[in-house]
Regions:
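HDAC/HDAC-like amidohydrolase catalytic core signature
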Residues: 1-144
Length: 144
């Protein structure tokens, strides 16, 4: 069985704070575990592309996206009690949201049997108009 792995080193640029539980080491641990398990021969690696606005706006209204762009331009900040943007967070979030689309395309093209997106920040808690639970965008909804 072949596995399409969609990931990118730029996900490590999302830093929510030194003591924040959603930290770069989480992704590093996943990738180290894959390597330690000797799974490299089963992997088809792909890099994500930042999600296109047309795909992003199917889930998130322009005003919500603009507020994230503005905060990114200001260098980041706290969005809610759990969710923080740092200087590399907005690009990482757009890449994470685009990763699911790359995975779907790869599966449709027959590049692999299954896909795994090793991304950060995560993207399963955000609502269309709110960040939540470490998530800036809802990657799952974008991919759907």
């Amino acid at each position: 069985m072949s596995v399409l792995l969609v990931t990118d080193e730029r996900f490590l640029d999302h830093v929510a704070g030194r003591s924040h539980p959603e930290r770069p080491a989480r992704l590093t641990a996943v990738l180290d575990g894959i390597a330690a398990a000797g799974l490299d021969d089963a992997l088809v690696r792909r890099a994500p592309s930042p999600v296109a606005d047309v795909d992003l706006f199917r889930v998130h209204p322009a005003g919500h996206v603009e507020s994230l762009v503005d905060l990114d331009s200001a260098g980041g900040g706290r969005l809610d009690p759990d969710t923080v943007m740092g200087p590399g967070s907005w690009l990482a979030a757009r890449l994470a949201a685009g990763a699911g689309l790359v995975a779907i395309d790869g599966l449709r093209n027959g590049d692999a049997d299954v896909a795994f997106c090793a991304v950060r920040p995560p993207g399963h808690h955000a609502t269309p108009t709110r960040t939540m639970g470490f998530c800036l965008l809802n990657n799952v909804a974008v991919a759907a």
